[in-house]
Amino acid sequence: MSYRQLGFIFFLILPFFVSAQTSTQLSASEIKLGLKKLNTLGSALYIAAHPDDENTRLLAFLAKDKNFRTGYLSLTRGDGGQNLIGNEQSELLGLIRTQELLAARRMDGAEQFFSRAVDFGFSKTSDETFRIWDKEQILADAVWVIRKFKPDLIITRFPEDSRAGHGQHAASAIIAREAFIAAANPKRFPEQLKYVQTWQAKRIVWNTYNFGSLNTTSESQMKLDVGKFNPLLGKSYGEIAAESRTNHKSQGFGSAKQRGQAFEYFIHTEGDEAKTDIFEGINTKWNRLVEGEKIENMLKEAELNFTVDNPAMSVPALVNIYKALSSLPDTYWKAQKMLELKEIIAAAAGLWFESYTLQPIQTLGDSIHLRSEIVLQSSVPVKLIRVNKQILNIELKEGIAKTILSSIQANEISEPYWLVNNHPQGMFDIKDQLLVGYPEKRSTALIDFIISIGGQEISYQRPAEYKFTDQVRGEIYQPLIVAPAITASIADKAYVFPGNTPKTIQVLLKSFRDKSSGTLIPKIP
């Protein structure tokens, strides 16, 4: 069976192995936190080797206290790890651990990235690791993520030497340092520059650790208290970190919540050396953008006047900020803040919209019948201009849900993009450069909602999902799955042929349509 078939078949049952999602809407305190984040133009990227290597406490602090755009680049998907919740190994385990990382990021507020490296199991040294990994290709992937994400600060979990305790750990630190340098060099991986620009991060540091038997921390190192309490969330970052880390269920990483002071320690690796604070010299103000100061002042005023009892009162000011931001020259930070701002506007206005199907599996080439629902939960005047190609021009009324029926074509099979092609031991084979780094391929079943609010048209996209109500768990959302019309698999994993004696092989066919017919022609090797 090919990796592509393996990935697709498991994709059908993956929802049973990961935590089902429920859709949520931002609370007033989360909207206020979002306003603070809007006024912070800083970013940090954490780099390590595997799922569960990341420091969730530091990620939560960076994302929710410093309000940085925060990411974690795991070079592998953890294919070579243990599995305490099932029998899945190798690529199937990598699928599970990918979902565990995404669940963890939903808790701590960071974003998730991967390279094409395969976790092939334990290795003693980085040299041994690079005999199996294609170092140059993985370096290119890390450079690609850095050039797209544009971090001001890069942080590694491990050192480059034997203290890392694992060859892949040490290799991740080497890749991170070399990528920090190469990302700024236009002569390195120039083929990427038709999509992205070079990027020079301010510095790269090593986040040292005390793992009990191995303590690499010292009071002479830069340190940062990440154990603070966030009153807007009602939690400390130690509590958020435990909730995040507990999602690594296949590794048995259920974690106790920690409260109170907690220090992280850092050693300078490359770039502008900081003396006492890893954030030294990083400009997080709007003056990074031409005419950005006016946006900063408008956001400060919006935050000052924000009322938790009635977030909708802030909508006119937020729409004015959106208009002002739209007029600025196109930059990375303009695009990022436009995305953040329009979600804050929708949340403050009490706008809820979604698109879903009642069928768990769709068939390639068929029409997917969707229900799109939108409801306004405030008195803010909002007009629904269109949903996809349906022109509506409807004035939404407070508390009255509007349902729109539509259909889209199921034009692409749901499958993990990194398993489409067969691959060697150490590397996934990914043909499309634009997919590199993503945890999953973005859904092609995206529904456009165009609204008019405060005289400004704003476009939103929501993925079409499968929604159902479970008698025990309640309302559940799962990814919409598109399957081929028919799949075929061999009943047994292996057959023994003694001599030239023929054997009967059972082939299992499954149709994802009500009625299917055809002829099965086996290709004998």
What are these regions (language model features)?
Residues 2-3, 20-44, 125-129, 135-353:
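Metal-dependent de-N-acetylase/amidase catalytic core
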Residues 322-365, 466-500:
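Low-complexity, acidic Ser/Thr/Pro/Gly-rich terminal tails and inter-domain linkers that flank the onset
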Residues 398-463:
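Eukaryote-biased detector of low-complexity, proline/serine/threonine-rich segments
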